[in-house]
From Swiss-Prot:
Keywords assigned: 4Fe-4S, Cytoplasm, Iron, Iron-sulfur, Metal-binding, Pyridine nucleotide biosynthesis, Transferase
Main location: cytoplasm
Name recorded for this polypeptide: Quinolinate synthase
Gene3D superfamilies documented for this protein: NadA-like
EC annotation from Swiss-Prot or TrEMBL: 2.5.1.72
Residues given in the record as [4Fe-4S] cluster binding sites: C113, C200, C297
Disulfide bonds: none
Length: 353
């Protein structure tokens, strides 16, 4: 049985796009960032959904491009004393939870996530308290405070396996915050899942009718879909998976044309993985609607070259992530529980986020 907890639909105010830099300014900030990384004993870790020039700079300077959990784990294994996290705020918090001894900086602390914003800790706590018989599973795309309330934290690549495991133990689930991913794991597992009603502003916009028209234009194309997308879109996919899983699918699928339903930032690493293939964004407009995100997270777009340089140079309250130690310890419990479960299954945990 699956129930849906309805909360008021939210229209999140989008941040202003960064002022574009000209070629000379880009070159200036790239060199400045390289210098500051050395001066601050820092490493740049970037999410798959940041702009291509940021991902390229992370690779060029010895950092990494990955999902949120792998970003934090890379930082843990790297000797640098400072992590510059190019992503959204919960990613910086996750890095700090797993690396308390390191300084964690971000280009801006105002880079939000609609899944995080759509799951405020007080409301979520009250919801969980009203269903005390359920095991609480939260997606990685949540605040440290929400993680601290959970029994498990999960990434998209291991979500189905974990819910199947909990279902086999007879446990009923609270799932938060993404309703589409919750619906996907419920359908795959058959578990009793009560979903919080959140959504990613990017994936929520993918449209079935528009995708069908695009598929008609490219009948030989494979469709790759992130499970944060609506179920009707997921049902059209040739491959469904997390960011890392979609990149792997792009490599292994025989089709030379790919229609990709996730943030277009992933195209940088996906094209690296299969340079001989042609990639198209799945449509986010149509069916009587215009796109708001247009397949790119507006908060990810805040991680520009100028902002990264300012984060490294200024630090302080505008850029440094702090997580209360008691809260960090509480959030670490469900995170470690997930990692231990993954190790038992001999799975490599790589998920969106």
């Amino acid at each position: 049985m699956s129930e849906i907890f309805d909360v008021n639909a939210a229209i999140y105010p989008f941040p202003a796009r960064p002022v574009p830099l000209d070629t000379n300014e880009k070159a200036f900030y790239r060199e400045k960032i390289k210098t500051l990384l050395k001066q601050r004993d820092a490493v740049l870790v970037a999410h798959y959904y940041t702009d291509p020039e940021i991902q390229a700079l992370a690779e060029e300077t010895g950092g990494c491009v990955a999902d949120s959990l792998e970003m934090a784990r890379f930082g843990n294994n790297h000797p640098a004393s400072t992590l510059l996290v190019a992503g959204v705020r919960f990613m910086g918090e996750t890095a700090k939870i797993l690396n308390p001894e390191k300084k964690v900086l971000m280009p801006t602390l105002n880079a939000e996530c609609s899944l995080d914003l759509g799951c405020p800790v007080d409301e979520f706590t009250a919801f969980c308290d009203s269903h005390p018989d359920r095991t609480v599973v939260v997606y990685a795309n949540t605040s440290a405070a929400v993680k601290a309330k959970a029994d498990w934290v999960v990434t998209s690549s291991i979500a189905v396996e974990l819910i199947e495991h909990l279902d086999s133990l007879g446990e009923k689930i609270i799932w938060a915050p993404d309703r589409h991913l919750g619906s996907y794991v419920q359908k795959k597992s058959g578990a009793d899942v009560l979903c919080w009603q959140g959504a990613c502003i990017v994936h929520d916009e993918f449209k079935t009718q528009a995708l069908a028209r695009m598929k008609a234009l490219y009948p030989d194309a494979a469709v790759l879909v992130h499970p944060e997308s609506p179920q009707a879109v997921v049902d059209m996919a040739d491959a469904v998976g997390s960011t890392s899983q979609l990149i792997q699918a792009a490599k292994t699928l025989p089709q030379k044309t790919l229609i990709v339903a996730t943030d277009r930032g992933i195209f940088y690493k996906m094209q690296q993985a299969c340079p001989d293939k042609e990639l198209f964004e799945a449509p986010t407009a149509g069916e009587g609607a215009t796109c708001r995100s247009c397949a790119h997270c507006p908060w990810m777009a805040m991680n520009g070259l100028r902002a990264i340089a300012e984060g490294l140079e200024q630090g302080g309250v505008m850029h440094e992530i702090h997580v209360d130690e008691e809260l960090r310890q509480q959030a670490l419990i469900p995170l470690n529980r997930m990692l231990d479960f993954a190790n038992q299954l001999k799975l490599q945990v790589k998920g969106n986020a």
